[in-house]
């Protein structure tokens, strides 16, 4: 009898683990990844991820953070009402000359796994950036 009760308890706990709500069930982000393209060193690019509450209840963003200190997401301080879209500002420092890929995490109240989005690009030294821009032509604008 103890084995049956133990098995039933384990089974119910397993079902509960699979029934966890996911971030994708309550929010929709306009894009999973934003590519800044080429950016000028020490000119921090900014992107605004759009987060929409697709549930029927307010969504609380407990925290936002990035995979390193060179990337700064703003905090979302107010609950997101059902059907409402808010913007999450993400800024990259652009201090180091190199390609970059950085993850940004969005932790929602009541959901264990945070939602992740990503920014990518390549930082060029100022002279190299200006040369690249001239080669692209005056008609084209950088992405950032």
Model-derived regions: residue spans:
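Long, low-complexity ectodomains and other extracytoplasmic segments of secretory-pathway proteins
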Residues: 20-43, 50, 111-144
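Beta-strand-rich extracellular modules
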Residues: 93, 107-111
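Surface-exposed binding patches on compact interaction domains or structured appendages
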Residues: 56-84
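Short strand-edge motifs at loop-to-beta-strand transitions and within beta-strands
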Residues: 34, 84-90
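Asparagine-centered strand-capping/turn motif at beta-strand->loop junctions
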Residues: 51-55
């Amino acid at each position: 009898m103890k084995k049956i009760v133990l098995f039933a308890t384990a089974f119910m706990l397993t079902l509960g683990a699979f029934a966890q709500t996911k971030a994708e069930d309550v929010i929709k982000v306009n894009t999973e990844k934003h590519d800044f393209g080429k950016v000028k060193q020490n000119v921090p690019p900014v992107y605004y991820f759009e987060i929409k509450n697709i549930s029927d209840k307010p969504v609380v963003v407990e925290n936002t953070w990035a995979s390193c200190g060179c990337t700064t997401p703003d905090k979302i301080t107010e609950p997101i009402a059902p059907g409402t879209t808010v913007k999450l500002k993400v800024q990259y420092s652009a201090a180091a000359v190199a390609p970059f890929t950085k993850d940004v995490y969005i932790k929602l109240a009541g959901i264990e796994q945070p939602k992740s989005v990503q920014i990518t690009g390549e930082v060029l030294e100022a002279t190299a950036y200006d040369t690249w821009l001239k080669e692209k032509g005056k008609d084209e604008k950088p992405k950032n």
